[in-house]
From Swiss-Prot:
Belongs to the CowN family. The gene is cowN. It comes from the Bacteria. HAMAP family: CowN (MF_02117). It comes from Magnetococcus marinus (strain ATCC BAA-1437 / JCM 17883 / MC-1). Keywords: Nitrogen fixation. Is required to sustain N(2)-dependent growth in the presence of low levels of carbon monoxide (CO). Probably acts by protecting the N(2) fixation ability of the nitrogenase complex, which is inactivated in the presence of CO. This is N(2)-fixation sustaining protein CowN. The keyword Glycoprotein does not apply.
Length: 99
């Protein structure tokens, strides 16, 4: 019987997982998706403002990973509404490995 390969326990170590790079890649994808919209809900307008800061945060400000992980529900909802399978896959991997 074939058993699926076990996924490593993400809580053992975050070493060698490029969480910051994955978050920046997803953030860029989100920005492109949102900027293509004719009108944006106030939530996404504020999100884009925070995203600009999150790319180069100062001490005490949220970085890209924190911004994405703290808004994962809304991001998944956006990708589902847009039928963006690539975005959903990136978000799923980031959430599983890093959030």
């Amino acid at each position: 019987m074939n058993t699926p390969a076990a996924r490593p326990d993400r809580y053992q170590s975050f070493a060698h997982i490029p969480c910051d790079a994955m978050a920046l890649k997803l953030l860029t994808h989100l920005e492109q998706l949102l900027q293509a919209e004719d009108t944006l809900e106030p939530f996404w307008q504020l999100f884009l403002q925070k995203a600009a800061i999150a790319k180069q945060p100062q001490p005490g400000q949220a970085d890209a990973l924190k911004l994405i992980c703290s808004n994962s529900y809304y991001i998944f909802d956006l990708f589902a509404a847009q039928q963006d399978q690539a975005g959903e896959a990136m978000m799923d991997e980031l959430e599983y490995q890093c959030c």
